[in-house]
A protein has these predicted regions:
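Acidic, low-complexity/disordered tracts enriched in E/D and polar residues
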Residues: 2-67, 136, 363-455, 499-502
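Hydrophobic alpha-helical segments that drive targeting, anchoring, or assembly
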Residues: 10, 27-115, 133, 138-147
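Long, charge-rich, low-complexity alpha-helical segments
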Residues: 64-115, 171, 185, 358, ...
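SAM-dependent Rossmann-like transferase core, predominantly class I methyltransferases
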Residues: 102-165, 170-178
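Conserved SAM/SAH cofactor-binding pocket of Class I
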Residues: 147-231, 237
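Conserved Class I SAM-dependent methyltransferase catalytic core
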Residues: 192, 253-306
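Mobile active-site "lid"/loop adjacent to the S-adenosyl-L-methionine
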Residues: 193-194, 233-259
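Flexible, glycine-/basic-rich loop-and-beta segments that form/coincide
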Residues: 312-391
Length: 502
C-alpha cells in the first residue's frame, strides 16, 4: 500500500515552456561534447576549476551555442536579440516568466540566467540539468547541481539492469537520470519542495517518466521495496541543525546515516542492493569500522569503503567554503568555533567519507569494512557488481574443501612487483606484491611460496593439487600451507586478483 501520493507541486518549467526549450537546446546542440569542443581543452578545464574568463573568451565567437554558454554557464548578460535567436522558438519573456531567465539589472535590456541549466552526460547518455545558481548558495533550500558528490555516486553505481530503483534524496535528479537507462521504473524522493520542483523540470526537459514523492528519508516509500536504491543523503556530520537542506540532516553527528543504514534493507527486494555515500565519525577510544558495522541489521552483505579522512579543522573548513562562508570573517570564525566545539565535545578525532554498498541476503552475511584512500581513475560501478558476484562465489565455497577443489587463475591486469634494497653486495630483494592495474588497484604483499602458488594459478589444476606441489617444492607441510594460504586466497578472490575458472 502506498503511503505517499505523487508530488503535485508546481514544476519550475510549465509544459508550454519545456517543449520549446528542449527544441532550442537540441537545435543549438547544447551538449557536453559540443560545449567541450567549443571551449577547447584548456578553457574547458579552467571552467571546471571555476575560472570563467578563459571560457568566456573561447565562447566569444561561438554563434548561438556561444550565446547559451555565456548566458547559462558563465552568468553573463546577453542582448535580447541574441537570446531570442538562441532560444527560439522559446521567447526570452516566456523563459523569464518560467523563472529560467531574469532581466539584466544594468538597464541594457538584456537577459541573465536565473537558474543553472547545463548539459550533463557520460557513457549512459546526454541530459540537461536544472539547479540553483551558485550565487543563491546562502539560501537554506539551495539545490546544488552536478557536484563532486553526485559524480562520485554516479560513477560508483552498479548499472546492471533492474526492475525498480529508488533515488532517495534526489536533489536536482542526477542519479535518477542515470537510473532511467537501466531501471524499468524509477522513483525519486526529496524532503525539499524546491528540489522536487527542479527535479521535475529536469525530468520533463529530458522527457523522462519518474515517480516523484515528497517527504523525509524513507517515509514516502513506507511499505515498498525496490531492486536498487541509490542515495546521496545529507551526510555532513556536525551539530543537530539544518543550515542547508542538501547537506545537513538535522541529527547530531552520524546518527542520521546510522538510522538510514539500519532502515534501508527493509526496503530492498531479496537480493536488492543499496548504494549510498556517507560520512562517519572517528571517535576517541572507538574503532571506526566497528562503529559502522554496528549500524547494520541482520541479513545484509555490506561493503564499506573509506575513501577520505579529514581532521576536524579540515572537515569544518571544507564545508564552510562549500557554503560560500569566509572562514576568516567574524561570522565564519563564530560558525567554525561552534562546530569545532561540538566535534571536540563528542570526542571526534577525524571524519571519514566513503561508499556503502548493502545487499539483502538470505545467506550468511559478508561484511567488509576497508580503506581505499587515494585517487583511482576507473569508475567503481563495475567493481561493485564484481564484488557482489565474488562474494556469492566465496559464500558457495565457504567450506575449505570446496575452495581447495576450485580452479583459479590470476586475473587479467594483475602484475607481480618486486622491490630491492641496497646492501653490502648490491641490491637485495626485500619483498614482493601482486597488484591490480585496474579498478581500485588493490595490492597484496606476498612471500616467495605465495608468488609461486599464484604463478601456478592458470585454471588447469585445483588449488589442493597446487598446494601439494608447493609443499614438495618448498619442503613445507601441506597442512601448514593450507592453513596459511586459504585466508589469503579468499582475500585475493574478493579483491579480484584471483578469478574462478569454471
Amino acid at each position: 500500500m502506498l503511503s505517499a501520493t505523487p508530488w503535485l507541486g508546481a514544476t519550475v518549467l510549465p509544459p508550454t515552456v519545456t517543449g520549446p526549450l528542449r527544441e532550442a537546446l537540441t537545435r543549438v546542440r547544447y551538449t557536453t561534447d559540443a560545449v567541450r569542443a567549443l571551449l577547447g581543452p584548456s578553457a574547458h578545464a579552467a571552467l571546471g576549476r571555476g575560472e570563467v574568463e578563459p571560457a568566456a573568451r573561447a565562447a566569444r565567437d561561438g554563434g548561438e551555442l556561444g550565446v547559451l554558454v555565456r548566458l547559462l554557464l558563465l552568468g553573463e548578460v546577453e542582448p535580447d536579440a541574441a537570446v531570442a535567436a538562441a532560444l527560439a522558438p522559446l521567447s526570452p519573456a516566456d523563459a523569464a516568466a518560467a523563472g529560467l531567465l531574469a532581466p539584466a539589472d544594468d538597464g541594457s535590456g538584456g537577459w541573465t540566467a536565473a537558474l543553472d541549466l547545463r548539459p550533463y552526460g557520460d557513457e549512459d547518455g546526454d541530459w540537461w540539468v536544472l539547479s540553483d545558481l551558485d550565487r543563491r548558495h546562502q539560501e537554506r533550500d539551495h539545490v546544488t547541481g552536478v557536484g563532486a558528490a553526485s559524480l562520485t555516486l554516479a560513477a560508483a553505481t552498479d548499472r546492471t539492469p533492474v526492475g525498480s530503483l529508488l533515488d532517495l534524496g534526489t536533489g536536482c535528479g542526477v542519479q535518477a537520470l542515470h537510473a532511467g537507462r537501466h531501471a524499468r521504473a524509477v522513483t525519486a524522493t526529496d524532503l525539499a519542495p524546491r528540489a522536487l520542483a527542479l527535479a521535475a523540470a529536469t525530468f520533463a526537459l529530458n522527457d523522462l517518466d519518474v515517480e516523484l514523492l515528497e517527504g523525509p528519508w524513507l517515509e514516502p516509500v513506507a511499505g515498498r521495496r525496490f531492486d536498487r536504491i541509490v542515495s546521496n543523503p545529507p551526510f555532513v556530520p556536525g551539530p543537530a541543525r539544518v543550515d542547508y537542506v542538501y547537506r545537513d540532516s538535522g541529527r547530531a553527528g552520524d546518527d542520521a546515516l546510522a538510522a538510514l543504514v539500519a532502515d534501508l534493507p527493509a526496503h530492498l527486494e531479496p537480493g536488492g542492493v543499496a548504494q549510498l555515500l556517507g560520512s562517519w565519525l572517528h571517535v576517541r577510544g572507538e574503532d571506526w569500522p566497528d562503529r559502522v558495522r554496528s549500524w547494520l541489521p541482520p541479513g545484509v552483505d555490506a561493503w564499506i569503503l573509506q575513501r577520505e579522512v579529514a581532521d576536524p579543522a579540515l572537515h569544518v573548513g571544507t564545508w564552510q567554503r562549500d557554503a560560500g562562508i569566509d572562514p576568516a570573517s567574524a561570522a565564519g570564525r563564530a560558525h567554525a568555533a561552534q562546530w569545532l566545539d561540538w566535534l571536540d565535545g563528542a570526542g571526534v578525532e577525524a571524519v571519514g567519507f566513503g561508499h556503502l554498498v548493502l545487499r539483502r541476503t538470505d545467506g550468511p552475511p559478508t561484511v567488509v569494512v576497508e580503506d581505499l584512500l587515494g585517487d583511482i581513475a576507473d569508475p567503481l560501478g563495475p567493481e561493485v557488481a564484481g564484488w557482489l558476484e565474488r562474494v556469492d562465489w566465496l559464500r558457495a565455497h565457504a567450506a575449505d574443501d570446496a575452495l581447495l577443489g576450485a580452479r583459479l587463475a590470476v586475473a587479467d591486469g594483475v602484475v607481480l612487483e618486486t622491490w630491492s634494497e641496497p646492501g653490502d653486495e648490491g641490491w637485495t630483494t626485500a619483498g614482493s606484491a601482486v597488484a591490480r592495474l585496474d579498478g581500485p588497484r588493490w595490492r597484496h604483499e606476498v612471500d616467495t611460496p605465495a608468488a609461486a602458488l599464484l604463478a601456478g594459478c592458470r585454471g588447469a589444476l585445483p588449488l589442493d593439487e597446487l598446494l601439494e606441489l608447493l609443499s614438495f617444492a618448498h619442503d613445507r607441510p601441506v597442512d601448514a600451507l593450507v592453513a596459511a594460504t586459504l585466508p589469503a586466497v579468499r582475500e585475493l578472490v574478493r579483491h579480484g586478483l584471483l578469478v574462478p575458472v569454471p
